[in-house]
Amino acid sequence: MSTTDSIVSSQAKQSSWRKSDTTWTLGLFGTAIGAGVLFFPIRAGFGGLIPILLMLVLAYPIAFYCHRALARLCLSGSNPSGNITETVEEHFGKTGGVVITFLYFFAICPLLWIYGVTITNTFMTFWENQLQMPALNRGFVALFLLLLMAFVIWFGKDLMVKVMSYLVWPFIASLVLISLSLIPYWNSAVIDQVDLSNIALTGHDGILVTVWLGISIMVFSFNFSPIVSSFVVSKREEYEKEFGREFTERKCSQIISRASMLMVAVVMFFAFSCLFTLSPQNMADAKAQNIPVLSYLANHFASLSGTKSTFATVLEYGASIIALVAIFKSFFGHYLGTLEGLNGLVLKFGYKGDKTKVSMGKLNTISMIFIMGSTWVVAYANPNILDLIEAMGAPIIASLLCLLPMYAIRKAPSLAKYRGRLDNVFVTLIGLLTILNIVYKLF
């Protein structure tokens, strides 16, 4: 074979799309599609048609550029098998490692609190509206559900992980199926409410504020940051030695782009289908009731008068069940990350990093009591879920997903080539706007 043929063959091999790339594309996509998606239509549809159209324009750039920035940070370490904690320690020392451990824990733990509130409200709504049973004590329901999940986690962790992986695709398929099945129920209410002569850009209910708050729920819903570090390590081990760091970065960006497109297509279609079936006022009611959109859809179809279609009857019961399964799936997935993070913090600060001073069983018990106890307190208090996402969950995710990579690009020599780019400004702006929601909620 000539030198030219070898070069052509090498280039063809480099440009090929492998089965592992498809697996990771679907893995990133599946990680992001969870219970958080069930609240996106409520916030997106709350302000009517124009804000959700603006969110549609922003959705892909937010998903792609923010996750690409985090992936570039993970790629910047000298060790191809090093995770994000090792990479941050390499750039910023041990203090940086402690900071990233705290960020990871506090980025995931509030999500468990959110899911604790959500699963309690969803179950109680299903119990009272679909099953027509008398109301139960909120504290008892929250405690029962959390103890049930704790039992499953304690005695069947391996089974739980396997079941979670099987639930991802049926949940995504059910979202797409529901979105398509809602089309016959679409109406023009959301379009009729558009009054171009009376549009307010500013103010509490203005378009800009609605989109600003919508950015937070997009950061929350379009989030697969927990798996980015593992994804980058896998791709570096697969590609870097043979093709180099630059090619690996392009391959990671390509996979993140395709995963983001899939994610945005499914979530935005679901959001639009819900909005055209319901109305902005219905979305406001769902927010006030503190329930996910599927539970509200179930109640909506239950209240229809006259003869119901088969779909309406199935959705009346099926929507809440799908929501419960989605929340269970998301809770289990985030619990594992929270447990790992809290174990690390307890070990580091309680036992000075000495693993011989405490058994793993005792460590897991201490962490589980704190996690489940704090989740029960929040679930019983029943704060508004969207407010909790916007004021707590999304800002912490944004600090990890957006601001940490941008700070690293400014400071780390290995990331210097990415400085001065327009997409850095965009990612920084998204991170700051999301964090500033905390200030907005206070005032």
Swiss-Prot record:
Subcellular location: Cell inner membrane
Entry keyword set: Amino-acid transport, Cell inner membrane, Cell membrane, Membrane, Symport, Transmembrane, Transmembrane helix, Transport
Pfam family, one: Trp_Tyr_perm
Any one GO biological process: amino acid transport
Membrane topology term: Multi-pass membrane protein
TM segment ranges: 22-42, 44-64, 97-117, 140-160, 163-183, 207-227, 259-279, 319-339, 366-386, 389-409, 423-443
Matches recorded under Gene3D superfamilies: Amino acid/polyamine transporter I
Cellular component terms (Gene Ontology): plasma membrane
Catalytic activity: L-threonine(in) + H(+)(in) = L-threonine(out) + H(+)(out); L-serine(in) + H(+)(in) = L-serine(out) + H(+)(out)
Alphabetized GO MF terms: L-serine transmembrane transporter activity; symporter activity; threonine efflux transmembrane transporter activity; transmembrane transporter activity
Domain of life: Bacteria
Protein task: Involved in the import of threonine and serine into the cell, with the concomitant import of a proton (symport system).
Assigned protein family: Belongs to the amino acid/polyamine transporter 2 family. SdaC/TdcC subfamily.
Annotated HAMAP family: Thr_Ser_transp_TdcC (MF_01583)
Name of the protein this chain belongs to: Threonine/serine transporter TdcC
